[in-house]
Amino acid sequence: MIPRTSTSLGWRLARAALLAAASVWLLSLILVLVWERMDSRRDAHAIVVLGAAQWDGRPSPVLRARIDHAIELWEQQLAPRFIVTGGRGPGDTTTEAAVAKRYAMSKGVPESAILTESEGRSTSESLRNVAQMLRSEQKDVILVSDPFHMLRLSILARRFGLKPRTSPTRTSPISKNRSEYFKYTMAESWKAPVAFFFEFSK
């Protein structure tokens, strides 16, 4: 028979663990909401556009919103480099980065200013590759993506030695769709702590 004191201790530990996990999640959610409202753009070495879906060689509305915002930053002459990211999805014939590059060029960004990162299959891989593309003394970047993405992007960018500023697009269709916005925000509130603790376990 298991002693009652052992059972009681087990329940207390389980309750404490659940409370700690809930506290971490709540703090993460608050930080996701805070970060999505921040726009810390300033002069940098590169503007980095995080990839999103492309449809048969055309940028999806989400990807287009990100590129359009990055072009606004480019036109403000905040950075000399314009980096587009994103690999090839299952069944795709081209990469998100290639589509983003063509679209940016069609809007006036010169090809000579654009760098493409087309190997990454995740946010983490893309940012790691971007860090490798930039010389050690040129790590200041402005990260462009959807608002809910900003906290985790900052965490991951720092892991790879980048010095990130964030500037979220305000025109993404995800932000205008309550159910989609809720879904992605909740997902980021779980992903951000994983990225944070993984960073500091290195």
Label each region the model flagged.
Residues 26, 177-202:
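A transmembrane-helix-recognition feature enriched in membrane-embedded lipid enzymes
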